[in-house]
Each structure stands twice: as structure tokens, then as C-alpha cells.
Amino acid sequence: MNSKIFAVLLLLALLSCVLSDQYCPKSSITACKKMNIRNDCCKDDDCTGGSWCCATPCGNFCKYPTDRPGGKRAAGGKSCKTGYVY
């Protein structure tokens, strides 16, 4: 009986996570000098602890998702490299 209750609670918790929309946070920076552009990540797998790889004017950084839209996830791709981009 206890295992059935636990299974139902676990299913409800997973369902609420899947149904809630998550976004990269909106960047407060609108522009960045080219010499300061740096990528800490290129894809979500480069980030730890449930954070996402999000694009900003100053590069890609690992950020925790938020429920407010406005940010942009990093596109990644073969041309993306970590470190300074200049």
C-alpha cells in the first residue's frame, strides 16, 4: 500500500515538472564589446546541477531556468567553442 502511494506521489511530482514551462532567464545586458564575449557552455550538457546553456550578448552561460519567458537558449552547433570568442 505504501509503495502505491509513493508511486502516485512520484508520478504527480514528475508530471508537475513536465507541465511547467521553463525558460532561460532574460539577460539584463543588451550589448557587449567583442573582446569580452565568452562562452562558458555550448549546450545544456556542458552545464551542471540542472542549469541550462543560455545565450546572452556577452556569450553563453549556464543559468537556472525560470518560469518567465524572455531569455534565449544557446544554439550550440559545431562552430560553438568555449572560452573567449574574438
From Swiss-Prot:
GO terms for cellular component: extracellular region. Residues 1-20 form the signal peptide. It comes from Lycosa singoriensis. This is U15-lycotoxin-Ls1d. GO terms for biological process: defense response to bacterium. The lineage of its organism: Eukaryota, Metazoa, Ecdysozoa, Arthropoda, Chelicerata. It is found in: Secreted. Keywords: Antibiotic, Antimicrobial, Disulfide bond, Secreted, Signal, Toxin. GO terms for molecular function: toxin activity. Residues 21-66 form the WAP domain. Belongs to the venom protein 11 family. 01 (wap-1) subfamily. It comes from the Eukaryota. Has antibacterial activity.
